């Protein structure tokens, strides 16, 4: 019997396992396949260094700037060099392995090649997690069960904490890691917003490798085929200026869904279960970035689990501490606001977004608000919105 069983060893699950193990409790960390590279752009905010100071010792690709383009290619460029700590870009296969190993070093017991598919029940109560392995089915019993296995989690549905995602609640993305000579600014990441609800990105990974991809959002998923959108994006004449070669080596490619409306408030906990990371919607509705928010959710759930175990009471009363955790409250609030901004920005073929970039190039205050909204999911002020509306 474990104190805590966690399904999923991504950023949320690994941080949660680390926190609980450091608290002196017995924790099982289950993973379906540690060699699977999660499809992702791989941009990581410098805020993550607060939770993983070990990353500073690694040779990561530093990012000190961002270039954003509206659907009509109005540009907003921003650099935070010498202002704040650099962010960085990563290959998710390597990044996830690093933070997983940190949780194992802290004392978490890791079980790879275990596909979670249901709960273990006793007297109608969920007391563990069932998995499928090459050797057969296994059961991991725990006092607290934590769902951290992403968008496609079977446990999320079986727990009844949330229903299956519908197409109008998610984003659909496709990306690739490519290699070859390029003219990208290695210090900056680039975002290319479309006239419909969607955007593309190019993130340098080193001198020659880069992550390139795109996604559609919400109802745009119905009117746009992600495979066609991807081909259109990588062949966009505007992007050719960065890529002088005729062909580039494709190292890896993948498609993936992600939650697009923020955190599902009523899906965070119940009885002896908590849900964290992508499973619970910890992805920014406006940028699609989810690594930082997922790590915060793992930290909060880990602290909450320790609180419940220390008080020898595992119930809604003790687990509600997770939802009221200060940083979780902040993320929930900010994501709700930025989700509403998505509708506003994409009105009239993205005209409001284009106007914002135009204003940001002439008004320092507007520029700072715009950057904080995209990079840190900070809600805009009423003055900011009124300025944009006045340009319509």
Please annotate each region the language model reported.
Residues 306-392:
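C-terminal helical "tail/cap" subdomain of flavin- and related membrane-associated enzymes
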Residues 9, 19-40:
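Glycine-rich FAD pyrophosphate-binding loop
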Residues 81-102, 154, 220-225:
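Short beta-strand to alpha-helix junction loop
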């Amino acid at each position: 019997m474990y104190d805590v069983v966690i399904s999923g060893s991504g950023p949320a699950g690994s941080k949660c396992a680390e926190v609980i193990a450091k608290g002196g409790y017995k924790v099982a960390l289950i993973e379906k396949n540690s060699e699977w590279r999660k499809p992702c752009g791989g941009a990581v905010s410098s805020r993550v260094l607060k939770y993983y100071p070990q990353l500073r010792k690694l040779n990561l690709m530093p990012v000190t700037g961002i270039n954003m383009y509206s659907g009509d290619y109005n540009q907003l460029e921003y650099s935070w060099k010498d202002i704040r700590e650099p962010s960085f870009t990563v290959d998710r296969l390597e990044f996830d392995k690093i933070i997983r190993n940190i949780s194992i070093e802290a004392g978490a017991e890791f079980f790879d090649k275990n596909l979670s598919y249901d709960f273990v029940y006793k007297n109608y109560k969920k007391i563990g997690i069932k998995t499928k392995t090459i050797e057969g089915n296994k059961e991991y019993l725990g006092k607290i069960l934590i769902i951290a296995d992403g968008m496609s989690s079977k446990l999320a549905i079986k727990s009844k904490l949330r229903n299956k995602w519908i197409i109008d609640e998610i984003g659909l993305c496709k990306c690739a890691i490519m290699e070859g000579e390029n003219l990208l600014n290695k210090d900056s990441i680039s975002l290319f917003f479309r006239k419909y609800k969607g955007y593309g990105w190019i993130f340098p990974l080193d001198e020659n490798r880069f992550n390139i991809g795109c996604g559609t959002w919400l109802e745009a998923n119905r009117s746009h085929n992600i495979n066609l959108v991807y081909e259109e994006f990588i062949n966009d004449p505007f992007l050719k200026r960065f890529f002088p070669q005729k062909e580039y080596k494709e190292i890896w490619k993948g498609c993936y869904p992600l939650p697009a409306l923020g955190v599902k408030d009523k899906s965070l906990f119940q009885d002896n279960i908590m849900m964290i990371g992508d499973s619970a919607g910890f992805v920014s509705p406006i940028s699609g970035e989810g690594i930082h928010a997922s790590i915060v959710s793992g930290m909060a759930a880990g602290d909450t689990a320790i609180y419940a175990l220390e008080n020898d009471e595992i119930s809604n009363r003790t687990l509600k501490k997770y939802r009221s955790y200060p940083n979780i409250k902040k993320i929930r609030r900010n994501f709700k606001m930025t989700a509403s901004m998505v509708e506003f920005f994409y009105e009239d073929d993205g005209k409001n977004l284009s106007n914002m970039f135009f204003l940001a190039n002439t008004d320092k205050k507007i520029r700072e608000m715009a950057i904080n909204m995209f990079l840190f999911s900070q809600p805009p002020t009423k003055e900011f919105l009124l300025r944009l509306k006045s340009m319509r």
